[in-house]
């Protein structure tokens, strides 16, 4: 049987490929069969390789096969741009490009009706969450601490407001007070939706609370601890201490009658501290023109009071020299502007950017009235040799446009007037 089986393929090979056995081994029959084997091998090898990634470039790229991020492709956006966790304070899910174009979403523990009093018509735009998802972290992250977009930054997100609020955290036996946002940390998570909602709705609605006139006005509704009173003086240039000393005990007693026994000693000590330090604080932080005149008379100087807001960066020897150029302004009454603006004729206050016309008229001008940018104002005040002239003086031909560097001493500038 084995011999017959060996003869049959040889006979078949002779019929197909030729008479000799060598033709069967190396003849055209193997050449005819080899392309089929190669095709089968190619098919099996091609299927064994995994398919290329849909985001990988094609093997032969040309102008018809460009792989780029399509901002209008929804399927590509949802895969590539994943929303970041809400614990990141600077890249919340409300920012465009991170998490898609989502609407304004409130945390689950805050009712949705709270968004209308302080967000207004901007509640459905791309804005970060007003509070983080964790209720224990409320009021401590600066991007979430009542910072509701560019229109409300001046009211709810300024550093003086947040710095003063965070000084009242370590008060013993303290409960949720009116106008203090850091006390969310002392409220349990299950009570946040019940306790914080009425107070927030009454504090941040412009029409409900008459005391909430400005972000610094809410500083009257709580009292900082005694050891932090020295820190509270710097970021409060606008606070009226006569109202703050009399208003805080009344508000605390009316808002929290059950806690009078625990907070009365603290209130009394804080009021005493305010009365002791009131003179120094008023001299440093007063903004009205009458306070400027009284400070000038009391100190016996002709210079304007110290600028409380960022004046150390912009105040130069040239700036201090400019203050001493107007000795006749010293005897004016408090009703008249001490330093009137040459354009709007309003008072030039300490915290406002002002420019002195050293070219001729020696008048003060608001930076906003002159149209000068903050960058140009910073360069002007940083350069001691720079001289600015108003439009009226520059229109006259009598102004000396070229000066030597030695002519910038105080006698030379006083002689130009």
From Swiss-Prot:
- Covalent S-S links between cysteines: none
Q: Which GO terms describe its biological process?
A: canonical Wnt signaling pathway; hematopoietic progenitor cell differentiation; kidney development; positive regulation of transcription by RNA polymerase II; protein localization to nucleus; spermatid development; spermatid nucleus differentiation
CDD domains per the UniProt record, alphabetical: PHD_PYGO1
Where does the record place the region Interaction with BCL9? Answer: 371-389
| Zn finger region (PHD-type) | 338-396
Could you tell me where the Polar residues compositional bias lies? 180-221, 240-256, 284-305
The entry lists its GO molecular-function terms as:
histone H3K4me3 reader activity; zinc ion binding
User: Its principal location?
Assistant: nucleus
Establish whether keyword Membrane is in the entry. no
Name the UniProt key words of this record, in alphabetical order.
Metal-binding, Nucleus, Wnt signaling pathway, Zinc, Zinc-finger
Q: Where is this motif: Nuclear localization signal?
A: 35-41
Gly residues bias locations:
18-27
Q: What does this protein do?
A: Involved in signal transduction through the Wnt pathway.
How this chain assembles, per its entry, is: Interacts with BCL9 via The PHD-type zinc finger motiv, and thereby becomes part of the nuclear beta-catenin/TCF complex. Found in a complex with BCL9L, CDC73, CTNNB1 and PYGO1. Interacts with histone H3 mono-, di- or tri-methylated at 'Lys4' (H3K4me1, H3K4me2, H3K4me3); the interaction is enhanced by the interaction with BCL9.
Q: What is this protein called?
A: Pygopus homolog 1
What's the source species for this entry? Mus musculus
> Gene of origin?
Pygo1
